[in-house]
């Protein structure tokens, strides 16, 4: 029953954003619900014929794709067990059909996401206000200082970091960079490479 939505998304050439809602279940509260449901959603999408039927469909998933990058090996094994022989059918390749925001709070998590799906599938995201606004007692910094984490990825060059921080979003959402520059206050940088890279709070 989602097909009419997919058809319209492709017709308009716009991006769908998957972000779970909260939970009323004590066993699966808030953040855990986000991760579990986003993981389940990705699994269902990539094991369906949605991208066969809508090859131009663009979907971005919040929170780095839930648990998917971390558990990729299990899902990879599952596709092989079910008969996947063409490399394009492997779950690791299917993962690259989606886009993922960088709302992750550790260096290891950000780096795993990039290694799993590639630079071109990572879109800078921040969560302020949100869970990540909390200040870590050990570092004294907000957990959601994601731009710093991206800039600290040692295996990426400057251009690749800028791709994640702003250039990928410009391409995906077809943003008018010149108009954005003109709209910026005079006391800000023309193209930010730090925490302002995606324009503020939310994903």
Model-based region annotation:
Residues 26-46, 54, 58, 63-203:
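H/E-rich (His + Asp/Glu) clusters that bind or coordinate divalent metals
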């Amino acid at each position: 029953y989602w097909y009419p939505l997919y058809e319209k998304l492709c017709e308009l050439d716009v991006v769908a954003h998957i972000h779970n809602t909260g939970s009323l279940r004590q066993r699966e509260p808030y953040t855990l619900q986000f991760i579990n449901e986003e993981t389940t959603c990705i699994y269902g999408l990539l094991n369906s014929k949605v991208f066969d039927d809508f090859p131009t469909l663009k979907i971005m998933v919040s929170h780095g794709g839930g648990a998917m990058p971390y558990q990729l090996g299990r899902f990879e094994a599952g596709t092989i067990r079910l008969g996947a022989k063409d490399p394009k059918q492997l779950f690791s390749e299917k993962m690259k059909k989606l886009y993922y925001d960088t709302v992750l709070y550790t260096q290891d998590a950000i780096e795993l996401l990039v290694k799993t799906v590639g630079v071109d599938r990572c879109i800078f995201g921040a969560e302020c206000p949100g869970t990540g606004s909390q200040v870590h007692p050990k570092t004294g910094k907000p957990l959601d200082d994601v731009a710093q984490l991206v800039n600290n990825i040692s295996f990426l060059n400057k251009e690749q970091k800028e791709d994640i921080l702003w250039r990928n979003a410009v391409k995906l959402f077809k943003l008018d960079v010149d108009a954005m520059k003109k709209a910026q206050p005079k006391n800000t940088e023309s193209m930010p490479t730090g925490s302002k890279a995606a324009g503020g709070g939310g994903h």
